């Protein structure tokens, strides 16, 4: 349905008006920039969602393979549970928070639009015409505001001009419009309004969609809100914000807001947080002239005061809407018609606020998950290191415990015999009295003392024996227990804690190792039980009892009297052999001990096998975290962080080149992000691996708290058109200092200054180590000096947490510790590098040590370092300084001093040499000046 005779040609229109073509160009540039950065945000979000999906799939796949028994040689409940627990604990927590994902998805799905509100429909139409620079809508033919029925209007881009009715976001209505029936210069009023006699609900809700070949509409849709009487503004905004980001303009033509206007604005502020661009439209027919001669002071404007009262404006903001330094968008009031161009500034702030908030939210998700990855890498690395040591320690301590208990069993047999004799002597009278007074069970004893049958006599004798045996058992067991109690203090506490840590990832049902340990410890406690379970001790006692019975001779069955019971007990006690009893108890103790020891060893082997499988999985996961998961997420984090920085501070301007390194070029940058002056390092990663490494290193640098001994990193920007568009570069903007230590030593530095620099470097390295980072490239050119010659460490390009180091050989050959070539090293490599650096500091020059200067190639140098080549002692060196250097560059990392020891040593050297230097010539170090 094309309109005929329309005034627009084939080229996009940008006509005259208060803002002129310049305003439209600025608006187009601003909205085009928003679309461009929104596309990058959308791409980053899409890749982030894919990353989290991949993590979830990896987690589910690994858990499934664990439960189905795949991928393991020796598997059992312990291995399954441990492996599943490993994945569940270490991967399932990495997920996209639903709230943030929904928020970000809504932002990238919403395109911007300009929404025109106003005091009445005429002034809204007038503002639309000013924006487009052409007379599209009538501004004088519409009826009064009370009777106006202006429907919602949407202006979109199209190659041809079309006017149609359509339900918002749905379908076009088949309806004949007046615009279709002939030529027109402005859209006919009948097409703009809802007819009073129209009862078709769809027709009433429909919006008039106008497509035009216009430069501004190529970048953004423009929506004119319907009149208040047809639909409340709050409802219109509510529908719009689901699919669009509105840049709200409010057209004014009166000097004050009416009560109805204030109510409308109060409702908008109550339900929405969008800023509003208030623009006072010039009266029809008036000339647009420079308003400098008639500009009203802001504090005298009634509109300004009303908008302050409504909370839209602040008294600290200038009413003409000039751009401020605030990153958040603020409402503006423009009362001079020629300043409509400030709409481009306002829209830029609205769009930038939206993008910055989204980029910040996305980067927080990235950083949070990266920190989880790094923490997990530390946990996994510690697990890989400590678990084998715990297993070996457990085996060693249990063996010591076993041998100690076995020695007790062998050594104390004679003591046990004496203990049994002593116990019998002590308890004899008590046992005889108890036997005399005991009441028999299941035996009827005549009160007149008449004899009873042989069967009853045997039953009575047996009960007397049982009384003696049970009482003796209890006494012997208690004394035996006390003889091994001290072992609980010396062995059990540490061993049990070690076992608990080894078994905490296992199911409760498989805690058998600890059970066997308890059996070893409690062997003495089970003495009483074994007496009642058919052991050799019990059999021996019953043989003695039979002999007692045989020795008791009678012609006829005796009477059960007190004397008889005492006599039976006396015979039983006297016939017991203390030596045989002690031997039997010790033998039983050793048997139980051997059994528990063997069971413990077997159980520990099973536990070790379970941990072996788990550690294999842990190492695989650790490698995936270091090589894949963390670098991939770090690159997304770098992109979201750089997007945030470029939105806030724009792309930095490159100044003169300051230097070149292996991985980038350093430029001067006069001013960026409020920092002055700056240094800018441009890095062009040649491949995916370098991209990921750079991203991880940037995350470590950005995550570090500010420290006075480290060069500040201000931000980063990704330049997608670096080198004329031939490559993509990461621009790292950092603090600029006066010079590096290499240049400083060449120029000459005093002894006190040099020693203070050494202290500063140690302080900086200690801070890095406290954050879990290893620098790996401490050297002269990576120590920068300010104008006061205080040192700061820079170039954290090789800096990594210990748990994330892959063993790659990095650094500068002269400063590289020998173990770096093996791929297995820790933060002591920085101590080694400091030792070499301290040699230069003490020498006061940049001349190479002789041992290194003779090397013809890098490989030659590396081989010499591995064989123990070190810098020579110079005549100017103080003895304590030389000893400190030698200790720092010791070939054995374990023998190098901790930096917490080095720092006070350096301070002592500085106090001694510099104080003595002020009183007398220094005997140890020359003062280079």
UniProtKB/Swiss-Prot annotation:
Organism annotation: Homo sapiens (Human)
Tissues of expression: Predominantly expressed in skeletal muscle and testis. Expressed in basolateral and apical membranes of all tubular epithelia. Expressed in thin ascending limb of the loop of Henle and the distal convoluted tubule. Expressed in all layers of transitional ureteric epithelium and in the ureteric smooth-muscle cells. Weakly expressed in heart, brain, placenta, kidney, pancreas, spleen, thymus, prostate, uterus, small intestine, white blood cells, stomach, spinal cord and adrenal gland. Is widely distributed in the CNS. Also detected in several tumor cell lines. Expressed in the skin.
One GO process term, biological-process aspect: positive regulation of ERK1 and ERK2 cascade
Annotated ATP binding sites: 658-666, 681
UniProt-annotated location(s): Cytoplasm; Cell membrane; Apical cell membrane; Basolateral cell membrane
Pfam families linked: Pkinase
Disease entry from the Swiss-Prot or TrEMBL record: Congenital anomalies of the kidney and urinary tract 1: A disorder encompassing a broad spectrum of renal and urinary tract malformations that include renal agenesis, kidney hypodysplasia, multicystic kidney dysplasia, duplex collecting system, posterior urethral valves and ureter abnormalities. Congenital anomalies of kidney and urinary tract are the commonest cause of chronic kidney disease in children. Spastic paraplegia 23, autosomal recessive: A form of spastic paraplegia, a neurodegenerative disorder characterized by a slow, gradual, progressive weakness and spasticity of the lower limbs. Rate of progression and the severity of symptoms are quite variable. Initial symptoms may include difficulty with balance, weakness and stiffness in the legs, muscle spasms, and dragging the toes when walking. In some forms of the disorder, bladder symptoms (such as incontinence) may appear, or the weakness and stiffness may spread to other parts of the body.
One GO molecular-function entry: protein serine/threonine kinase activity
Coiled-coil residue spans: 189-215, 395-431
The encoding gene: DSTYK
Similarity comment: family membership: Belongs to the protein kinase superfamily. Ser/Thr protein kinase family.
Active site residues of this protein: 777 (proton acceptor)
Positions of the Protein kinase domain: 652-906
Main location, first listed in the record: cytoplasm
Name of this chain's protein: Dual serine/threonine and tyrosine protein kinase
Keywords: ATP-binding, Cell junction, Cell membrane, Coiled coil, Cytoplasm, Disease variant, Hereditary spastic paraplegia, Kinase, Membrane, Neurodegeneration, Nucleotide-binding, Serine/threonine-protein kinase, Transferase, Tyrosine-protein kinase
GO cellular component: anchoring junction; apical plasma membrane; basolateral plasma membrane; cytoplasm
Record field: catalytic activity: L-seryl-[protein] + ATP = O-phospho-L-seryl-[protein] + ADP + H(+); L-threonyl-[protein] + ATP = O-phospho-L-threonyl-[protein] + ADP + H(+); L-tyrosyl-[protein] + ATP = O-phospho-L-tyrosyl-[protein] + ADP + H(+)
Region (Disordered) residue spans: 1-21
Enzyme type, top EC level: transferase
Record-listed E.C. numbers: 2.7.12.1
Function: Acts as a positive regulator of ERK phosphorylation downstream of fibroblast growth factor-receptor activation. Involved in the regulation of both caspase-dependent apoptosis and caspase-independent cell death. In the skin, it plays a predominant role in suppressing caspase-dependent apoptosis in response to UV stress in a range of dermal cell types.
Composition bias type Low complexity, residue spans: 1-14
InterPro entries xrefs: Dual_SerThr-Tyr_Kinase, Kinase-like_dom_sf, Prot_kinase_dom, Protein_kinase_ATP_BS, Ser/Thr_kinase_AS
CDD domains, per database record: PKc_Dusty (cd13975)
């Amino acid at each position: 349905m094309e309109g005929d005779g329309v005034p627009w040609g084939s080229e996009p229109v940008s006509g005259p008006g208060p803002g002129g073509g310049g305003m439209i160009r600025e608006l187009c540039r601003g909205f085009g920039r928003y679309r461009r950065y929104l596309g990058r945000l959308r791409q980053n979000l899409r890749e982030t969602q894919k990353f989290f999906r991949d993590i979830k799939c990896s987690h589910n796949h690994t858990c499934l393979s664990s439960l189905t028994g795949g991928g393991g040689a020796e598997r059992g409940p312990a291995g399954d549970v441990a492996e599943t627990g490993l994945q569940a604990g270490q991967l399932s927590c990495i997920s996209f928070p639903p709230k943030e994902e929904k928020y970000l998805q809504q932002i990238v799905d919403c395109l911007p639009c300009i929404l025109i509100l106003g005091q009445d429909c005429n002034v809204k139409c007038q503002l639309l015409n000013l924006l487009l620079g052409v007379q599209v809508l009538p501004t004088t033919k519409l009826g009064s505001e009370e009777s106006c029925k202006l429907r919602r209007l949407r202006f979109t881009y199209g190659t041809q001009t079309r006017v149609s009715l359509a339900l918002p976001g749905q379908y076009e209505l088949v309806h004949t419009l007046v615009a279709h029936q002939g030529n027109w210069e402005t859209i006919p009023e009948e097409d703009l309004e809802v007819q009073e006699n129209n009862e078709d609900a769809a027709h009433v809700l429909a919006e008039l969609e106008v497509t035009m070949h216009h430069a501004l509409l190529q970048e953004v849709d423009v929506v004119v809100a319907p009149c208040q009487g047809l639909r409340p503004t709050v409802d219109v905004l509510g529908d719009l914000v689901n699919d669009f980001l509105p840049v709200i303009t409010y057209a004014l033509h009166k000097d004050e807001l009416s009560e109805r206007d204030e109510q409308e604005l109060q409702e908008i502020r109550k339900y929405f947080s969008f800023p509003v661009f208030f623009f006072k439209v010039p009266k029809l027919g008036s000339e647009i002239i420079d308003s400098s001669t008639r500009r009203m002071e802001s504090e005298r404007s009634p509109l300004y005061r009303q908008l302050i009262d409504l909370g839209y404006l602040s008294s600290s903001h200038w009413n003409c809407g000039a751009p401020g330094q605030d990153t958040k968008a603020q409402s503006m009031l423009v009362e001079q018609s020629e300043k409509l161009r400030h709409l481009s500034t306002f829209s830029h702030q609205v769009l930038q606020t939206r993008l910055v908030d989204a980029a910040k939210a996305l980067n927080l998700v990235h950083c949070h998950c990266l920190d989880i990855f790094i923490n997990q890498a530390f946990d996994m690395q510690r697990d890989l290191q400590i678990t084998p040591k715990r297993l070996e320690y457990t085996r060693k301590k249990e063996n010591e415990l076993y041998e100690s208990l076995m020695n007790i069993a062998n050594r104390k047999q004679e003591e046990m015999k004496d203990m049994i004799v002593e116990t019998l002597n002590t308890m004899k009278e008590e046992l005889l009295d108890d036997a005399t007074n005991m009441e028999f069970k299941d035996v009827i004893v005549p009160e007149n003392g008449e004899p009873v049958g042989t069967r009853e006599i045997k039953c009575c004798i047996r009960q007397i024996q049982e009384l003696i045996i049970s009482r003796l058992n209890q006494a012997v067991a208690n004394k035996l227990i006390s003889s091994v109690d001290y072992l609980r203090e010396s062995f059990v506490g540490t061993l049990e804690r070690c076992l608990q840590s080894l078994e905490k990832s296992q199911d409760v049902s498989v805690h058998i190792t600890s059970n066997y340990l308890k059996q070893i410890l409690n062997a003495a406690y089970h003495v009483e039980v074994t007496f009642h379970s058919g052991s050799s001790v019990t059999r021996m006692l019953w043989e003695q009892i039979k002999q007692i019975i045989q020795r008791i001779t009678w012609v006829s069955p005796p009477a059960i009297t007190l004397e008889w019971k005492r006599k039976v007990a006396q015979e039983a006690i006297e016939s017991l052999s203390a030596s045989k009893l002690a031997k039997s108890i010790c033998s039983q103790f050793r048997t139980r001990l051997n059994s528990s020891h063997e069971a413990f060893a077997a159980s520990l082997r099973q536990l070790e096998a379970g941990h072996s499988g788990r550690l294999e999985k842990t190492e695989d996961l650790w490698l995936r975290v270091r090589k894949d998961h963390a670098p991939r997420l770090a690159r997304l984090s770098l992109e979201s962080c750089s997007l945030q920085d470029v939105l806030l501070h724009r792309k930095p301007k490159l100044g003169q080149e300051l230097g070149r390194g292996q991985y980038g070029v350093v430029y001067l940058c006069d001013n960026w992000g409020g920092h002055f002056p700056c240094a800018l390092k441009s890095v062009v990663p040649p491949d995916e691996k370098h991209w990921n490494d750079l991203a991880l290193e940037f995350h470590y640098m950005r995550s570090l708290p500010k420290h006075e001994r480290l060069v500040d990193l201000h931000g980063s920007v990704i330049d997608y058109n670096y080198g004329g568009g031939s490559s993509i570069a990461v621009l790292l903007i950092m603090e600029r200092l006066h010079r590096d230590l290499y240049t400083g030593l060449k120029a000459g530095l005093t002894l006190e200054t040099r020693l203070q620099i050494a202290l500063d470097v140690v302080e900086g390295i200690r801070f890095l180590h406290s954050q879990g980072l290893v620098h790996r490239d401490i050297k002269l050119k990576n120590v920068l000096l300010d104008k006061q010659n205080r040192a700061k460490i820079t170039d954290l390009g090789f800096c990594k947490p210990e748990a994330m180091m892959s063993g790659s050989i990095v650094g500068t050959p002269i400063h590289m510790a020998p173990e770096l070539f093996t791929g297995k090293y820790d933060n002591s490599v920085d101590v080694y590098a400091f030792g070499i650096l301290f040699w230069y500091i003490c020498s006061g020059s940049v001349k190479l040590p002789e041992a290194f200067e003779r090397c013809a190639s890098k490989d030659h140098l590396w081989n010499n370092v591995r064989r123990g080549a070190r810098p020579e002692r110079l005549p100017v060196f103080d003895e304590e300084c030389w000893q400190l250097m030698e200790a720092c560059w010791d070939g054995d990392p374990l023998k190098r001093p901790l930096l917490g020891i080095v720092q006070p040593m350096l301070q002592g050297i500085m106090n001694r040499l510099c104080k003595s230097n002020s009183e007398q010539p220094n005997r140890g170090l020359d003062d280079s000046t």
